[in-house]
From Swiss-Prot:
Subunit structure: Part of a SCF (ASK-cullin-F-box) protein ligase complex. Interacts directly with SKP1A and SKP1B.
Protein name as catalogued: F-box protein SNE
Protein function: Essential component of a SCF-type E3 ligase complex that positively regulates the gibberellin signaling pathway. Upon gibberellin treatment, such complex probably mediates the ubiquitination and subsequent degradation of DELLA proteins (GAI, RGA and RGL2), some repressors of the gibberellin pathway, leading to activate the pathway. Can partially complement the absence of GID2/SLY1.
Gene name tied to this protein: SNE
Tissue note: Highly expressed in flowers and at much lower level in seedlings, rosette leaves and green siliques.
Compartment annotation: Nucleus
Amino acid sequence: MSSEKRVGMVEKSNNKRQRVNQVPVFSINDHHDVLVEILRRLDGSSLCSAACVCRLWSAVARNDSIWEELCFRQVSPRPSLSLRSVVSALGGYRCLYFLCIRPVLARLPKLLWTRDQLQLSLSLYCVHYYERLYVGAWLGDAPPSSLIFLRKPVNVV
């Protein structure tokens, strides 16, 4: 890690050289801990792409703690520490991700809701809740019709 100032020679228009202090250049490769923190926040495909950048990034991307974070990002609370030794014996968190977690994530539908879709879903939920709460009591506990089916698109031909 070189944080010292660099000195360079600059040639002026009158053919005289003059010393000039240059600003130190920041390189992410000089800061291993920063690189680990950045890679730890990537998804699986981005982490694989980052491993192809250079040898250093490839070595850092093979770090098991990065893959552990990726595997258990969605799990709360985090599994116990005794699980770490079991996973290490079976090939590590990278193998766990590629053999178990990635295929499951690939099968899940990608839900990207717009603001209108979210508001519609919440409105339908409220209507459904009040129908169950109030209408059922008025009609002698008869099950009311629900509007929840409207959340899914209907193909009318």
